[in-house]
Amino acid sequence: MTMITPSFPGNSLAVVLQRRDWENPGVTQLNRLAAHPPFASWRNSEEARTDRPSQQLRSLNGEWRFAWFPAPEAVPESWLECDLPEADTVVVPSNWQMHGYDAPIYTNVTYPITVNPPFVPTENPTGCYSLTFNVDESWLQEGQTRIIFDGVNSAFHLWCNGRWVGYGQDSRLPSEFDLSAFLRAGENRLAVMVLRWSDGSYLEDQDMWRMSGIFRDVSLLHKPTTQISDFHVATRFNDDFSRAVLEAEVQMCGELRDYLRVTVSLWQGETQVASGTAPFGGEIIDERGGYADRVTLRLNVENPKLWSAEIPNLYRAVVELHTADGTLIEAEACDVGFREVRIENGLLLLNGKPLLIRGVNRHEHHPLHGQVMDEQTMVQDILLMKQNNFNAVRCSHYPNHPLWYTLCDRYGLYVVDEANIETHGMVPMNRLTDDPRWLPAMSERVTRMVQRDRNHPSVIIWSLGNESGHGANHDALYRWIKSVDPSRPVQYEGGGADTTATDIICPMYARVDEDQPFPAVPKWSIKKWLSLPGETRPLILCEYAHAMGNSLGGFAKYWQAFRQYPRLQGGFVWDWVDQSLIKYDENGNPWSAYGGDFGDTPNDRQFCMNGLVFADRTPHPALTEAKHQQQFFQFRLSGQTIEVTSEYLFRHSDNELLHWMVALDGKPLASGEVPLDVAPQGKQLIELPELPQPESAGQLWLTVRVVQPNATAWSEAGHISAWQQWRLAENLSVTLPAASHAIPHLTTSEMDFCIELGNKRWQFNRQSGFLSQMWIGDKKQLLTPLRDQFTRAPLDNDIGVSEATRIDPNAWVERWKAAGHYQAEAALLQCTADTLADAVLITTAHAWQHQGKTLFISRKTYRIDGSGQMAITVDVEVASDTPHPARIGLNCQLAQVAERVNWLGLGPQENYPDRLTAACFDRWDLPLSDMYTPYVFPSENGLRCGTRELNYGPHQWRGDFQFNISRYSQQQLMETSHRHLLHAEEGTWLNIDGFHMGIGGDDSWSPSVSAEFQLSAGRYHYQLVWCQK
């Protein structure tokens, strides 16, 4: 194969502007080099083997000159020769919007430009970058010097020393050009004109911030004239994986000589495992022969150490191009993982064993840097994923930074590599995939991804893109991948998740048991999908459990199904990280922004924040629920025997201790530690000693935790990987409390009932029927009366797609508003006081009404005895024709602000009725500030369920209830758009709920709280005791 001579359609800016390559779907590149795996062109095989920095690879990251223009036509021709006076300095890589030029736009489905493909607006923001640099003189004398742009959004033209070099688009894959003919001795100048919009933008309608610029690395690479132009490695096995073959196909370009040889050596650390040498000349392909510029070498490997996410064993393959006498011309290298992926009998298998995908979707996002990814952030993401029992990641919805795949190889994550194709805003969605004019553009996005990433063992599945419908173009691309790389399955959700263009049924947001009959592309329940006639493929949800704000309710139902049905092989949670961006107020204080905060239109508000972690990678409480449901050890208690089952496919437990503890109301009574010795997919029985039988009252709980005593590549020593709790018994008190000789005194006035006992007083307003005040000594305890509460500050899942300009009457919040739940007022039906032998009894009844209609009837009794305890009993009736309420509880504003909150119940993290399997029953003690979850969009938060006792300041509440406590009222949470605008109110707001509706999370745009977690009973009863410590 001979070197390609660049073509030059014209140097001038005027010629480029006239051609308008960015509005021609048939032009995806001009003079761009062919795709290949990342190169380093080592000139020393030892450096290639140890992956040392190559002297032939030079980074151009750093400060570049930059000028912004509203359209490419506004760029002066003189810019090609010299920097403009108005030019500033920006760092490359970066998004120019993060430097104050132009505005980022957040939109989900709607295109940010008028839909008229392939044309884009004449107002097309344009960034003009320039850089002066010198190159090593030896690079000019021989060989080829390339420039590599790893990511530019969305299209760009490149000049070097005033001469036009080429054009590229597809913002998420490299564009590489040969600069050899343009470089000169001394100083050289690059000029890069980046356009915000191009015809490629119609293929990049992903749910994300729309940003621009050179946002990935830029580098120079010097290769010899005769060079390795591509290499591909694959692993083959015998039936029991005891023998393997490393198959390496190497391609060269330049002057083909008989004396050229290729050596491929395989290394494990310092040990060479296998090696082979061959001249060029491929195997016979057809009657015309084979490829003269290619060679395939096959290296036999006995007892290979297999790669998996559990045990990411890696070898190193070094590919050397040399002469017959051994003189090295150049070397390339890559990590190799011996593993096999195939689908057999309806199951996705890795190394012969069925995978259970514990996956998450991940956008490349940084709150300060936009879409620029650095190694530290990538490693942080991987460590958090591994620590929280994720084993897979979907690159949603584009090929990621090249380093991401290397890190996934080394730390161990399964990767779905996804083409940069999404046309969600098209009507119909498949408009472009059924148009042959768009096949070249779509084809390059798929073929180049495969050619770049196919050497990575972590990549186990190719994806043809996201939400682009299904058409002839996708069918063609599916066939191309299956021809070129039959070693991996292909998945594609578009067109219904089960078309002919996918090997895996990969729906998004299909529910466990409920069908969703959408037009043309129904979403069956995942259980039903498996049983459809003729369907034999595995099902892996490409997106599920929409983690927007306070969400992930019902997550456990999915995992029950995954473990029950073998062909339900898991899924990818949507998604990993909140896509909020940092802005600064007038005082320089940072705050988290979402759609619309930059004046961007159109925008989809806070829909960009669906993460299991905040933008700064602080975990959401829901992450703990995901960790628990996905844990690799499962437990069953039978008598005094704990059965531990390992869901690891390849790992024998060699770094795990099982800690067990029996506690009564959080007080440890007995504990122990047992080393785990469990084979992959095996079991271990652990016999506990005779457990204590306490005589005192309380709940007896057995807790087991799996602890890793030693640090690993992804966790510190002491990491807890799995846990489970069982309630063994509940002993009731058999001793009567000591009789009090004091008797509370009741005073009745026209306005109030007042009860006094020592230094304590309780006041009930006879006009409202509420407990209006309490005193301890002369200190008031309440800032607002104790009232019924049936509402919550709406969650994202409660709001759904409803907004001011588009009301969705089916959304929970709109149903509550329409019924008057938020506007309901109490009509007093009864308020009486009685003096008993040793107590005072207050009896009240209220009808909560809106526009004359009764929504709730609440009947309460307050029994204040001689010990100062107030026992509250509540009975609530819900009108049959009103929507199920969000909660049934009590609310008040306490006068105190205490530093800490202590409770006996489920914790320590926020938990809700349909998201509490990860919470543990114990006695917890946290700062008041930790009881609030700082969701960027304020909403109901901080609930703790299963509470038996709550202590705050001088007060104690006992019973069986749920509570949240913070400095923010429900009203403020409802009226505030961003968390930084919240202000701490006087005192502390307390909600005590007898019952609370689930939060849902199957998706965030339709009501998704399962029926068993809705408050549909009609009648409710709860009680609690309020006293002072």
Curated annotation (Swiss-Prot):
PROSITE patterns membership: GLYCOSYL_HYDROL_F2_1, GLYCOSYL_HYDROL_F2_2
Annotated positions binding Mg(2+) 2: N603
Cofactor (UniProt): Mg(2+); Na(+)
Binding-site residues for substrate, renumbered to this chain: N108, D207, E467, E543, Y544, A545, H546, N610, W1005
Binding site for Mg(2+) 1: E422, H424, E467
Cellular component per GO, a single term: beta-galactosidase complex
Cofactor note: Binds 2 magnesium ions per monomer. Binds 1 sodium ion per monomer.
Keyword Magnesium found: yes
Catalytic activity entry: Hydrolysis of terminal non-reducing beta-D-galactose residues in beta-D-galactosides
UniProt: Na(+) binding residues: D207, F607, N610
Active site (catalytic residues): E467, E543
One GO term of the biological process aspect: lactose catabolic process
S-S pairs: none
E.C. code: 3.2.1.23
Single GO term (MF): magnesium ion binding
Keyword line: Glycosidase, Hydrolase, Magnesium, Metal-binding, Plasmid, Sodium
Record-stated family: Belongs to the glycosyl hydrolase 2 family.
NCBIfam families given in the database record: PRK09525.1 (NF007074)
Subunit structure: Homotetramer.
UniProt protein name: Beta-galactosidase
Organism: Escherichia coli
Top-level taxonomy: Bacteria, Pseudomonadati, Pseudomonadota, Gammaproteobacteria, Enterobacterales
